[in-house]
Amino acid sequence: METEIRPMSENDLEASAELEAMCFSTPWSLQAFKDSLDKPDIYLFRVAYLGDELVAQAGLIMSFDEADVINVAVKPEYRKQGIASGLLNELMRAGSERGVNDYTLEVRAGNHGAIALYEKLGFKSEGIRKDFYREPVEDALIMWKRS
């Protein structure tokens, strides 16, 4: 079955909030996702479906020609299948259409799988945010993909 990647809509919000809670210790709320859809000039989200099942999501917070990559979440049983790569490539393509040239993100320093994915997509580590994450406390790598 092929992965369908498309813009997040109202119909995706509950499944997105559930996926967020499954993947993160401090997840976005359903209301936060609702609020982001009301600000399409700032937030850009994409979701990935296999059949009727939401299996991944990712977003951008856009500011002029830069964007923060946020909320990259893939259901555990669907990781390492290229879904996140396809999702992020589509998200950055859509961001570029809106004038975004440079992308940044924070990732847990111990999340080696995600770091390898971001490096494969052209991101480079440019710094550390000490004790950035809570539950558990962990440093964040600051990564950039610059045009």
Regions found by a protein language model. Name each.
Residues 7-77, 88-90, 94, 98, ...:
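Acetyl-CoA-dependent GNAT
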Residues 9, 75, 79, 106-110, ...:
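Residue-level recognition of the GNAT/N-acetyltransferase active site
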Residues 69, 102-107:
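Conserved hydrophobic beta-strand within the GNAT/NAT acetyltransferase core sheet
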Residues 80-93, 116-120:
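Conserved acetyl-CoA-binding loop-helix of GNAT-fold acetyltransferases
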Residues 88, 111-114, 131-136:
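Short glycine/proline-centered loop/turn elements that form peptide/ligand docking sites
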Residues 106, 124-140:
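Conserved catalytic-core motifs of GNAT/GCN5-like acyltransferases
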Residues 139-147:
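Terminal substrate-recognition subdomain of acyl/acetyltransferases
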